[in-house]
Swiss-Prot record:
Protein role: Removal of H(2)O(2), oxidation of toxic reductants, biosynthesis and degradation of lignin, suberization, auxin catabolism, response to environmental stresses such as wounding, pathogen attack and oxidative stress. These functions might be dependent on each isozyme/isoform in each plant tissue.
Protein name, per record: Peroxidase 4
InterPro entries noted in UniProt: Haem_peroxidase (IPR002016), Haem_peroxidase_sf (IPR010255), Peroxidase_pln (IPR000823), Peroxidases_AS (IPR019794), Peroxidases_heam-ligand_BS (IPR019793), Secretory_peroxidase (IPR033905)
Keywords associated with the record: Calcium, Disulfide bond, Glycoprotein, Heme, Hydrogen peroxide, Iron, Metal-binding, Oxidoreductase, Peroxidase, Pyrrolidone carboxylic acid, Secreted, Signal
Length: 315
């Protein structure tokens, strides 16, 4: 009964936010909003292609902490801890300045209209598309929070050593199912990880990691030191959005433990990974659907929250 009540609550929250959000939300109030954001994001990624992964991750880290409300953008104050300082974000999350630049560009044409939360969501879509990923309609109309939630960030952002059960339960609490989990994890076809996050995988086990892959990665990630050294999550096509991530998992070449647990355990995720490795169109379609679904998590709409003037501070 308790689980049923939780599912009903999640469904009601999701459906209410969906009723408030729409791809055409700004058509009458700021017709150039989405094109202005797109131009700003494309400029940023053209300067640093890795930024695409950072922007997708930023949207994920925003939505998983008390909903898609741009709380991740807020800097600390004497009375508020910042999510930027949480375990999963500190010296790791990136793209804040890109969102700030996009916000400034939008403010110059439509002051006080477009939320930072919407800019983050649109930026993630535009980033995906720019590096070869799918283009999907982003529903907009979110409003920004007036608080940050560091404790929730420490609790609800996935750990790089998370088990499949931990990940599945976390995603379920956010209203996302197993297919959503596997599809969204495919964003790790892009980006890089610090040595600290995969050192344990290289040196503490040998059962679920390809020996050659492990040997190669150890060269730049020694057992002692080098914790901040970066390595691509997908060694083959690190800057292109494709389905190679899933082929890597099938070959025991997932860089993070939380990636490799999706394949090889006999769980239901095995068949989804196999499907995506063989059918890039299905992966692209499911990734788009999961991103839209994630963007509906616990949004602020109507008169809730505010439209921040700058994304790093409440009005």
């Amino acid at each position: 009964m308790a689980i049923f009540k939780i599912l009903v609550l999640l469904l009601s929250l999701c459906c209410f936010s969906q009723a408030q959000l729409s791809p055409t939300f700004y058509d009458q109030t700021c017709q150039n909003a989405l094109s202005t954001i797109r131009s700003s994001i494309r400029t940023a990624i053209s300067r640093e292609r890795r930024m695409a992964a950072s922007l997708i991750r930023l949207h994920f880290h925003d939505c998983f902490v008390n909903g898609c409300d741009a709380s991740v953008m807020l800097v600390a104050t004497p009375t508020m801890e910042s999510e930027r300082d949480s375990l999963a974000n500190f010296q790791s999350a990136r793209g804040f300045e890109v969102i700030d630049q996009a916000k400034s560009a939008v403010e110059s044409v439509c002051p006080g209209v477009v939320s930072c939360a919407d800019i983050i969501a649109v930026a993630a879509r535009d980033a995906s598309e720019y590096v070869g990923g799918p283009r999907y309609d982003v529903k907009v109309g979110r409003r920004d929070s007036t608080n940050a939630f560091r404790a929730i960030a420490d609790r609800d952002l996935p750990n790089f050593r998370a088990s499949l059960n931990d990940l599945s339960e976390l995603f379920l609490r956010k209203g996302l199912n197993t297919r959503d989990l596997v599809a969204l994890s495919g964003a790790h076809t892009l980006g890089q990880a610090q040595c600290l996050t995969f050192k344990g995988r290289l040196y503490d086990n040998s059962s679920d990691i390809d020996a050659g892959f492990s040997s190669t990665r150890k060269r730049r990630c020694p057992v002692n030191g080098g914790d901040t050294t970066l390595a691509p999550l997908d060694q083959v096509t690190p800057n292109s959005f494709d389905n190679n991530y899933y082929r890597n998992l099938m070959q025991k070449k997932g860089l993070l433990e939380s990636d490799q647990v999706l394949f090889g355990t006999g769980a239901s995720t095995d068949s989804i990974v196999t499907e995506y490795s063989r059918n890039p169109s299905r992966f692209a379609s499911d990734f788009s659907a999961a991103m839209i679904k994630m963007g509906d998590i616990q949004t602020l709409t109507g008169s809730d929250g505010q439209i921040r003037r700058i994304c790093s501070a409440v009005n």
